[in-house]
A protein has these predicted regions:
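Solvent-exposed loop segments that connect transmembrane elements
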Residues: 10-47, 83-100, 141-173, 215-260, ...
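Outer-membrane beta-barrel signature, preferentially recognizing the C-terminal barrel domain
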Residues: 97-112
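Face-selective signature of the C-terminal outer-membrane beta-barrel domain
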Residues: 74-76, 109-136, 167-308
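Short acidic/glycine-rich loop or secondary-structure boundary segments that cap or lie
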Residues: 82, 136-137
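Transmembrane beta-barrel wall of Gram-negative outer-membrane proteins
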Residues: 1-82, 110-111, 178-182, 190-194, ...
Length: 327
């Protein structure tokens, strides 16, 4: 059996004209002696800008191996593309918002699963397993950070005078890569069993890997105001030496902070249950469970100062439970 689909959803949020600067926000200078560069979103103004499109397929095949065994194989594949945001700014009006960085999302996954079900004499047996791969790339307008980001003026103004401030526009670029494998095997007694009780027992195994990159890009660092101070111009933001990195890539100068992380999780669960009939109306059930979980966390959080490209940040290969040092 197979099915293909394509669904296009129209938007209902309007991205309307607006301006943005650091003036009057967060820890930016106040008092009227600072010149602020003002950003506008004229290039991004659009009606109904939060549209999305789903494209995918699902195929499955069931097979009777013999009188005792059956097999089912299924594969799913989907791509999602979405633009805009799905909330609005009441200060702008109903279903209206002003965004200053293009909001985009591309999300794709594929999953293959297998189920085997059958009989081994006096036992019913079941195995089911699946493998998932998912990758998403997203860009988000994070300019609201200017309202709370205490250090943003350091990056976009002329340090140390702070009388010239570049745009307070911020974008976040996100990449997530996820892999997950699951297995479950269980057996249970069936109607031909001659035991005085019935039982079920099995094991479940789940292994997952998440690799994620989050780049926080202060777009005002590219403005002449940001390099008009007493410090040198920004350099590219290198990863921490020796720490795990998904690609080891150097971020452009505007991306002053990034997370580059890998999280692995392995869990194993054992379970068993026995049912003893005490009478026609009463059963005694005895069960046991054992569960093991192992989580590992490696990678880095990196931030770049002005001037020299020094190794500022946190190396989770060292502090992420790989030593006695706390996070």
């Amino acid at each position: 059996r197979g099915v293909c689909y394509n669904a296009k959803n129209g938007g209902y949020i309007d991205n309307v004209p607006g301006t943005w600067s650091g003036e009057g926000r967060g820890s930016f200078p106040s008092g009227g002696t600072t010149t602020f560069e003002v950003d506008d979103n004229a290039a991004l103004v659009e009606e109904n800008f939060n549209d999305s499109e789903y494209t995918g397929f699902r195929i499955s095949s069931a097979h009777s191996i013999n009188d005792d065994w059956e097999m089912l194989i299924t594969h799913l594949d989907q791509d999602l593309s979405a633009d805009g945001v799905f909330d609005y700014d009441p200060a702008k009006g109903d279903l209206l918002v002003s965004r200053f960085v293009e909001d985009t999302l591309d999300d794709s996954f594929s999953q293959t699963s297998l189920t085997l079900e059958g009989r081994l004499g006096k036992l019913d047996a079941l195995y089911t397993g699946a493998y998932l791969e998912r990758e998403s790339e997203q860009q988000v307008d994070y300019s609201g950070y200017a309202n709370v980001g205490a250090w943003l003026p350091y990056y976009v103004c002329n340090y140390t005078a702070y009388n010239l401030c570049g745009p307070a526009t911020v974008s976040v670029e996100l990449l997530d890569d996820n892999q997950r494998t699951t297995h479950e095997f269980r057996v249970s007694s069936n109607e031909v069993s001659d035991l005085p009780f019935s039982y079920t027992a099995g094991v479940f195994i789940d292994e997952s890997i998440l690799e994620t990159e989050n780049d926080y890009c202060y777009l005002g660092t590219d403005h002449p105001y940001a390099s008009a101070g007493t410090w040198a111009a920004y350099q590219a933001n290198n990863p921490l030496p020796g720490a795990w990195s998904r690609e080891g890539r150097v971020r452009r100068p505007a991306c002053r902070f990034f997370n580059d992380l890998k999280r692995t999780e392995e869990q194993t669960a054992y379970f068993a249950e026995m049912t003893f009939p005490v009478s026609d109306k009463l059963d005694l059930i005895v069960g046991a469970r054992k569960y093991d979980l192992d989580v590992d966390y490696t990678g880095q959080s990196k931030f770049g100062y002005r001037g020299s490209n020094v190794a500022n940040g946190r190396d989770y290969d060292v502090s992420g439970d790989h030593s006695a040092d706390p996070l």
